[in-house]
């Protein structure tokens, strides 16, 4: 009996070894490897993308030129529709240029506007999601590996990514609701790679860009003592501040603001004195954003985030007021 069992064990080990060897020979990598390669390619490659971004029926087209030279990142993101607006990335500085606003610069390492969040995630430390390889597809006349990022629950959105097999650049992404509706789609129409694109580094270096804008937010002490007892898996507090309500035309009032993120999605919770209108879980969806407003104990609570409405409601129900702050 023992000898027979050993034969079975040996057989299973042999089958496993053969399947592992076959997996290695095909060159198929685990999904995490594709995701890490994508983030590195976006940051350190030289390329030009013509792409569209679709959110809630609204479609805009863009051109992104990018290079990485001498340890520095350079990029130009140009809006191809309506009035000309562009964003310039020069190492750790982002400059916004356009005709309908005063140009300004911010100290930040990424272009976050009109690009999907999935490009900047730390996938090694991302919690509460599983990565699934869904095979190959063809996007913009290129072969792409399809990777799905699926939460372990129904309290966060899911993502599907199409990653170019050759360059590892993102060719397409979809942010999907718990009902599988597409909330946001990024799709490349044309990918161009050439050494000549490295010239944008010297072109950007020669530009006279707006001075860094200092955002002076008056440091105030919160008038409210409140806690959040529940958040979706992986969400952590990123920023906690109290702002002067005059900035938002709320005279002599302050607004508590807390920013949370799980590495892919973000949400904000605002608490302020009631403005005279009582809200009872007033909620709506605006593209990928959920907005929820409720009045509790003469205070207005507003939750805005890239999360399902049910998650926002659970967060709201978990907020506790512990009495007025001293």
Question: Which sequence ranges carry the predicted segments?
Answer:
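Gly/Pro-enriched, hydrophobic low-complexity segments
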Residues: 140-206
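Short, solvent-exposed recognition patches
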Residues: 208-296, 310
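N-terminal mature ectodomain segment of secretory-pathway/periplasmic proteins
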Residues: 23-100, 132-137, 143, 150-154, ...
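Short, gly/Ser/Thr-rich active-site loops of penicillin-recognizing serine hydrolases
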Residues: 194-221, 326
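Bacterial N-terminal signal peptides
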Residues: 11-19
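A short, amphipathic edge element
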Residues: 122-133
């Amino acid at each position: 009996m023992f000898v027979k069992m050993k034969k079975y064990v040996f057989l299973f080990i042999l089958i496993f070894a053969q399947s592992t060897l076959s997996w290695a020979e095909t060159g198929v990598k685990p999904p995490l490897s594709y995701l890490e390669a994508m983030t590195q390619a976006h940051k350190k490659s030289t390329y030009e993308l013509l792409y569209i971004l679709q959110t809630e029926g609204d479609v805009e087209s863009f051109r992104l030129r990018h290079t990485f030279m001498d340890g520095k990142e350079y990029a130009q993101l140009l809006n191809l529709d309506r009035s000309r607006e562009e964003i310039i990335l020069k190492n750790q500085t982002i400059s916004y240029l356009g005709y309908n606003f005063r140009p300004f610069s911010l100290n930040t390492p990424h272009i976050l506007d009109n690009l999907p969040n999935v490009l900047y995630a730390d996938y090694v430390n991302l919690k509460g999601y599983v990565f699934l390889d869904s095979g190959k597809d063809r996007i913009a006349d290129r072969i792409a590996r399809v990777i799905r990022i699926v939460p372990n629950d129904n309290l966060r959105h899911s993502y599907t990514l199409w990653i170019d097999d050759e360059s590892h650049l993102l060719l397409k992404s979809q942010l999907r609701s718990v009902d599988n509706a597409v909330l946001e789609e990024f799709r490349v129409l044309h990918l161009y790679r050439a050494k000549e694109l490295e010239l944008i580094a010297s072109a950007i270096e020669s530009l006279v860009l707006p001075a860094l804008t200092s955002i002076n937010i008056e440091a105030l002490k919160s008038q409210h003592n409140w806690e959040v007892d529940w958040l979706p898996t992986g969400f952590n507090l990123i920023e906690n501040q109290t702002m002067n309500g005059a900035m938002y035309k709320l005279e002599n009032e302050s607004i508590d603001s807390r920013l949370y993120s799980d590495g892919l999605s973000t949400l904000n919770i605002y608490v302020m004195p009631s403005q005279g209108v009582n809200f009872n879980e007033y909620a709506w969806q605006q593209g990928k954003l959920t907005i929820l407003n409720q009045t509790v104990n003469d205070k207005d609570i507003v939750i805005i985030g890239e999360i399902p409405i049910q998650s926002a409601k659970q967060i709201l129900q978990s907020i506790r007021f512990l009495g007025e702050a001293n």
